[in-house]
Regions:
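RecB-family 4Fe-4S metal-dependent nuclease core
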Residues: 1-344
Length: 344
């Protein structure tokens, strides 16, 4: 990895995060520097980046001579990367999290071991004859640190021209310390970088997951059955509300006002999306007959929410994505730039 490529990845972060959100920008930049230090000598080489696919949904339990496929729905998604690892082909997917990933038996890894996205993306790859051995989870953990006040002795040391967290400091940062005695964006970024470089296994992990043929058969039938449930719910106009899903970590579902009778779908608070899968660029039409992992997760979480989001395409005007989603999207974009240096 050249310094120039890392610089482009950092510039990508700067272009996506406003300067006023300097804490988020510094966190992402420091985490990107640590990622570069951790994986710059990686063996993986990228075959393709951000690859969209659309495949049939098959029913292998069909009593006929041949398996049948859905005449209405198709399964679609976007692979982060396809890579070559030790002469074998793999699908690689990036994840950002704030929980423990260092312990191989951590809850996070147990959940990913049965993650539907991995199963169905590998299944789609099998339909496309990609020859993927499995999926590699490329997981990045955000450090649980914040900008802090700098001790007097450290202030004097840095102002005198000594490094901060092992890195040289600009004149502007020195002046900021003299005036404020706390970390600014530059200093916080350096501390995040040092934290991740000193403990790479805590913040960066890659784990390959393989699926056997009989597992993929089960995955195929699960996808088929869920797709049939989606169609049944649509045809019968049956979308029960899961009241246990109205609040997630204290944040209300965006459709709670409609479900509780305080709003209507025809009010000025809502607009109807022309295409219900904004993350996919290659989908033609409104996408309402396209099944994705995100859509099925929504359907399993609350069928009423699924109806509003995917059957009707309802979206609240001016709704901002969560901070976690914004951070993940920003870091993902920087990773795409970084990985270009490893393209075959």
């Amino acid at each position: 990895m050249s310094d120039e490529t890392l610089a482009v990845a950092l510039d990508t972060i700067d272009s996506l995060v406003p300067e006023m959100e300097w804490k988020t920008r510094a966190m992402a930049r420091g985490l990107m520097r640590g990622y570069d230090a951790r994986w710059s000598d990686q063996a993986e080489r990228m075959i393709v980046c951000e690859e969209e696919f659309v495949v049939p949904i098959w029913n292998l339990a069909n009593k006929g001579i041949k398996p049948s496929q859905s005449r209405t729905l198709k399964f679609a998604g976007k692979r982060d990367k396809r890579v070559l690892r030790n002469s074998s082909r793999w699908i690689l997917d990036h994840k950002t999290t704030s929980v423990d990933i260092q312990d191989p038996d951590a809850t996070y890894w147990r959940q990913l071991a049965i993650n539907a996205q991995a199963s169905w993306y590998l299944l789609a790859g099998h339909y496309e004859d990609l020859g993927a051995e499995g999926i590699i989870w490329d997981v990045i953990r955000k450090p649980a640190i914040k900008p802090k006040k700098i001790a007097q002795t450290m202030q004097k040391s840095v102002v005198a021209g000594n490094p901060y967290c092992g890195f040289d400091v600009s004149d502007n940062a020195q002046a900021y310390i003299v005036e404020n005695g706390t970390e600014n964006a530059e200093l916080f970024e350096l501390r995040v970088t040092r934290e991740t470089i000193n403990d790479p296994d805590r913040y960066y992990q890659r784990k390959p997951i393989m699926r056997l043929l009989h597992d993929m058969v089960d995955d195929c039938q699960e996808l088929w059955q869920l797709a049939q449930d989606v169609l049944y719910s649509r045809r019968c106009n049956w979308q029960p509300c899961n009241s246990n899903a109205c609040l997630t970590y204290g944040s209300p579902c965006q459709y709670l006002g409609i479900c509780s009778g305080h709003d209507t779908i025809d009010s000025d608070n809502w607009r109807r999306r022309e295409q219900v899968h904004s993350e996919l660029d290659s989908i033609e039409g409104d996408g309402k007959n396209i099944i994705t992992t995100s859509r099925l997760a929504c359907f399993q979480n609350c069928r009423r929410k699924h109806h509003y989001r995917y059957d009707l395409g309802l979206e609240r005007h001016g709704r901002e994505p969560s901070a976690a989603l914004q951070f993940g999207t920003t870091f993902h974009a920087a990773l795409d730039v970084w990985w270009k240096a490893y393209k075959l």
